[in-house]
From Swiss-Prot:
HAMAP family: CPSase_L_chain_A, CPSase_L_chain_B. Mn(2+) 4 binds at residues 832, 834. Belongs to the CarB family. Mg(2+) 3 binds at residues 820, 832. This is Carbamoyl phosphate synthase large chain. The gene is carB.
Length: 1064
């Protein structure tokens, strides 16, 4: 049926800040949906609290609210906007849960707002374990034996009935939060206790474990006329038991017989029809490899991470189609935008293999628990396309940017057999490398299949890779074998290693005998119909489908997989760069490897190459396209790291030149530049070994800030207070980059701020200065940032503007740069300069209304600020106050310490804007899910050096009616100063937690925790009390503060919202 004309205004709820389990795929889906609805003539109102996304740009919807996704604010917006309808299935679990809450309180009914797409009853049926079980029993679809537990004892009883191993799944949590596999009653008790706490309805599903079954996913679509199709089916390399977001995934499925494929396809369509889903839906199934037995694992009645992957894998835009189905259109009347001929009813067919590998944050969190289970831990993912499994897998491996270019890992090579077996059996993020190593050592693949439950078909492909390696070692420079290796995804670097020559030599030989890649089109129909999508992947075959146009071309390098330190903000800048290039009449070509993002939507750029961001893969595209130049400023450190090798190969780098990038990144050159420009920086020195570092630190004076050069996201950076800790650091952490020296700086504990600037070579524009709430020492990405600054004198602001201009001109910056300053004793020092777009670009672009990445792109292409109507200097400051707050994913990462420091730990950000600082802070805390109760108890456990400062905060808490709880030392200090405080027992390093503060936290007797213990290295073992207290607070969902500046900020909010009661 045609689209509905009885509704005019539609509201969409976004997914909020990026956390593990809910990442950039919802920016992509939401952006697509908003544009699809606008295209059909509807007025779109968007609510989302995440400033880092394209989705929250003004032009994506008619009205955009960057406000917290809470009942309080969404209700306000509903009353103000009065939409006819609400579309909740595009904002991940956040959007769904919000729609449920709005429906429950009756506001949708009161305002006569209709829910579009899948009905709430269907969402309930899919999400509520008990209802879903009833539905599956009714339609004859098999589920795992299971029961619901609302207490730990009930869970034990159920488990005894079903038999171990048991899987625990808390109801209504995202990304498997709080769940896990239990082999014993002890494990069960622990996991269920935590799961019940995290489940909003205090329920856990206790079910039989089918670990070892194959995990298969079907991405399906259905419309209101009951047309239903399979868009894509996918198979996990890892058997059931690893969260699909953490698994290696292949599309289409590889090991299913036709009967198995049809059986599971029928089951998926049966379920989506029974649920009456309207739009996209993801069905996960488990198949017994030894029979036709299968189980339905779960259904996601919404657009998901898998649907983003399926969209990019097939070219079929699921979110866009879902939005059109929601307004009443049917699959047989929506044209497929890829072919522009076939209808959306036509199931995509693939003539290639897609591999997805997850990207994990364990390079940042060395102490994190790397074991993979039913709780998701990956921050992002990469996807690669090839003509066979070997090619797509190896391309995906080198897309990960973890320093490997093949499925071999030094640690795996160094492991003895015992460790190797252990790593194969215990699923970790790096298991692929250990399995590959086992095959290299001649362990039969049958034995590996038995141990790991990985299908022997996949292991045979890994064996094939090893066989090619063995042939390469003995047949050096053999042209036919070189072709075979390239067809199977081998990189030049890997072949060079096996031949013992340089990668340049392999590239030269390849070009001599014309072993060069061709580019194939992703067209949804396996080349059955003409297709016009400019979406390509490389492979070593005959016919090249990517035709070079006569237009002036520019290549933009994307930022690869999302990880801590390099998030969706860089994708945002990439997309804006593309828009600016198109506006200037250039052909914009994007190279990227991330399936979750907007930049890899083929409708964004003029041409999209889905390829790894390595020198070889990028260079092959440059050879074909012959662009005017390459832009590296917007792809984070990934793109910046490619600037030098590309430039050496004769490629023109547009914008700031390589030697100037070096002057900002190389310590000695940077110091010289600052001296020439007469700009102060904290005293510091470089050291290449331990003794040099110690001598430097003694000269500068402790505390020192120490880090390797050339890093993003504060990798391996620490604040060090004495020589013992310094020696420990030099022995433990400097493996981060052996050929680069270590930087030792004086640590100035002042106020920090940062500036993004745009320069055309002669003039410099500063869109704004952002003041950090947390003092220097907390990574800028983990600090709350306030714009405009609230505490700086005019003199300080003038100095910052002056230094920024000097640096931009002095470093010959063309385009964007980011500078971080610290203000110590009213003197401004420069901490660091990044000659590229930074993670604050989206936030600052939105609050100043200056399209920074687009402007910078125009500068890179030779335009100047004056011509574009901008005056140099600091842009005018708006009346509102805006706060950017970091958002963390600690609940998903066991054994990772949440104490903030110079190493970045946040996965996303939220924003709050209002007329006063207090109101903006309140919104940003709410948006970041840091909700403080109006009254209750606050627990203080602080280091000795923080006690004085904590006293004032404690007094403020008491003043607004909070009770104070503290451990012995802190309590005594509070009492001496006239405060009433309840004393609790410390942990005293023992296991017995009875009567201690941990018990208080566990039983909800504490509403907030202020904890600064463990800042010094001496106590950084994970067993420290401070760490255990922080873990407990996080697992209980209790607001935790490890920086006193954040506490002061939230107190400001609470004071502004409470009335004081004073006697006269």
């Amino acid at each position: 049926m045609p689209k509905r004309n009885d509704i005019k205004k539609i509201m969409i709820i976004g997914s909020g800040p990026i956390i593990i389990g809910q990442a950039a795929e919802f920016d992509y889906a939401g952006t697509q949906a908003c544009l699809a609805l606008k295209e059909e003539g509807y007025e779109v109102v968007l609510v989302n609290s995440n400033p880092a996304t394209i989705m929250t740009d003004r032009e994506i919807a008619d009205t955009v609210y960057i406000e917290p996704i809470t009942l309080e604010f969404v209700s306000k917006i509903l009353r103000k906007e009065r939409p006819d309808a609400l579309l909740p299935t595009l904002g991940g679990q956040t959007g769904l849960n919000m729609a449920m809450e709005l429906s429950k309180i009756g506001i949708l009914e009161e305002l006569n707002v209709e829910l579009l797409g899948t009905k709430l009853s269907a969402i309930d049926q899919a999400e509520d374990r008990e209802l879903f079980k009833e539905l599956c029993e009714r339609i004859g679809e098999p589920l795992c034996a299971s029961d619901i537990a609302t207490t730990v004892d009930e869970a034990v009883e159920i488990a005894d009935k079903i038999g171990y191993p048991i899987i625990v799944r808390p109801a209504f949590t995202m990304g498997g939060t709080g769940g896990g596999i239990c082999d014993t009653e002890e494990e069960l008790r622990e996991i269920v206790a935590n799961g019940l706490k995290l489940s909003p309805v205090t329920q856990c599903l206790i079910e039989e474990s089918i670990a070892g079954y194959k995990e298969i996913e079907y991405e399906v679509m259905r419309d209101s006329a009951d047309n239903a199709i399979v868009v894509c089916n996918m198979e996990n390399f890892d058997p059931v038991g690893v969260h699909t977001g953490d698994s290696i995934v292949f599309a289409p499925s590889q090991t299913l017989s036709d009967n198995e494929y049809q059986m599971l396809r029928d089951a998926s369509l049966n379920i989506i029809r029974a649920l009456k889903i309207e739009g996209g839906c993801n069905v996960q199934l488990a198949l017994d490899p030894h029979s036709y037995e299968y189980r339905v694992i779960e259904v996601n009645p919404r657009v998901s991470r898998s649907s983003a992957l399926a969209s990019k894998a097939t070219g079929y835009p699921i979110a866009k189609m879902s939005a059109k189905i929601a307004i009443g259109m049917t699959l047989d009347e929506i044209i497929n935008p890829v072919t522009n001929k076939t209808y959306a009813m036509f199931e995509p067919a693939l003539d290639y293999v897609v591999a997805k590998i997850a990207r994990f944050p364990f390079d940042k969190f060395e102490n994190g628990d790397r074991h993979l289970g039913t709780q998701m831990k990956a921050t992002g993912e990469v996807m690669a396309i090839g003509r066979n499994i070997e090619e797509s897998l190896l391309k995906a491996v080198r897309s990960l940017e973890i320093g490997v270019f093949h499925n071999d890992l030094q640690e795996a090579q160094d492991a003895d057999d015992e460790i190797l077996y252990e790593k194969m059996v215990k699923t970790q993020d790096d298991r692929l490398f250990y399995v590959s190593e086992a095959i290299r050592r001649g362990i039969p693949i049958e034995e590996i299949a038995d141990l790991t439950k990985i299908d022997i078909f996949f292991l045979d492909k890994l064996l094939h890779i090893v066989e090619i390696e063995d042939q390469l070692k003995v047949n050096i420079f053999e042209p036919e074998l070189l072709k075979t290796a390239k067809k199977n995804g081998f990189s030049d670097r890997q072949i060079a290693k096996l031949w013992n020559v340089s990668p340049e030599e392999v590239r030269r030989r390849r070009q001599e005998n014309r072993t060069i890649p061709v580019y194939k089109m992703v067209d949804t129909c396996a080349a059955e119909f003409e297709s016009s999508t400019p979406y390509f992947y490389s492979t070593y075959e005959w016919e090249n489908e990517s035709k070079r146009s006569s237009k002036e071309k520019i290549i933009v390098l994307g930022s690869g997989p999302i990880r801590i330190g390099q998030g969706v903000e860089f994708d945002y800048a990439t997309v804006h760069c593309v828009k600016a290039l198109q506006a200037l009449g250039k052909e914009a070509i994007v190279i990227n490897s991330n399936p979750e993002t907007v930049s890899t939507d083929f409708s964004i750029s003029d041409k999209l190459y889905f390829e790894p961001l390595t020198f070889e893969d990028v260079m092959n595209i440059i050879d074909l396209e012959q662009p005017e130049g390459v832009i590296v400023q917007f792809g984070g450190q990934t793109a910046i790291n490619l600037a030098e090798p590309l430039s050496k190969a004769g490629v023109k780098i547009l914008g700031t030149q390589v030697e100037d990038l070096d002057r900002a990144e190389d310590r000695d050159l940077f110091e010289k530049a600052l001296q020439d420009l007469e700009i102060p920086q904290p005293p510091g020195a470089t050291a290449t070994n331990e003794e040099e570092a110690v001598a430097n630190a003694n000269k500068i004076g402790y505390p020192v800030l120490i880090r390797p050069s050339f890093v993003l996201g504060g990798r391996a950076m620490e604040i060090i207070n004495n020589e013992k800790d310094l020696r420990d650091y030099m022995n433990r952490a400097v493996k981060a980059s052996p050929e680069h020296p270590v930087l030792v700086d004086s640590y100035l504990q002042g106020r920090e701020c940062e500036v993004d600037a745009i320069c055309d070579g002669t003039e410099v524009l500063l869109p704004g200065i952002m003041e950090h709430i947390e003092r220097a020492g907390v990574h800028s990405g983990d600090s709350m940032a306030v714009y405009p600054p609230q505490t700086f004198s005019q003199e300080i602001i003038d100095t910052i503007v002056d230094y920024t201009k000097r640096l931009a001109i002095g470093l010959n910056c063309i385009g964007m740069m980011n500078i971080q300053f610290v203000i110590f004793e009213e003197q401004v020092y420069v901490i660091e300069v990044n000659p590229r777009a930074s993670r604050t670009v989206p936030f600052l672009s939105k609050v100043t209304n200056i399209p920074m990445a687009q402007l910078a792109t125009q500068m890179i292409l030779g335009k100047n600020l004056k011509d574009l109507g901008y005056t140099e200097g600091l842009a005018e400051t708006p009346d509102m106050v805006h706060v950017k707050a970091p958002v963390f994913s600690f609940t998903k990462l066991a054994k990772v310490d949440s104490l903030l420091g110079p190493e970045m730990k946040s996965t996303g950000e939220a924003m709050g804007s209002d007329v006063t600082l207090e109101k903006a802070l309140y919104k940003s805390f709410e948006a970041a899910k840091l909700h403080m109760a109006d009254y209750g108890s606050v627990l203080f456990t602080v280091a000795d050096e923080d006690k004085e400062e904590t006293l004032a905060l404690a007094k403020d808490f008491a003043e607004i009616g909070y009770s104070l709880v503290a451990t012995q030392g802190t309590a005594a200090f509070f009492k001496e100063n006239g405060l009433y405080v309840r004393e609790v027992e410390k942990l005293a390093g023992g296991e017995d937690e009875e009567g201690t503060l941990v018990e208080d936290i566990r039983h909800g007797r504490v509403q907030a925790v202020v904890n600064t213990m463990g800042n010094t290295r001496a106590s950084l073992t994970t067993a420290t009390d401070g760490f255990r207290i922080r873990q407990e607070a996080i697992s209980r969902g209790i607001p935790l503060f490890t920086s006193l500046d954040t506490v002061a900020a939230i107190l400001k909010v609470m004071q502004s919202r409470s009335f004081t009661t004073k006697n006269i």
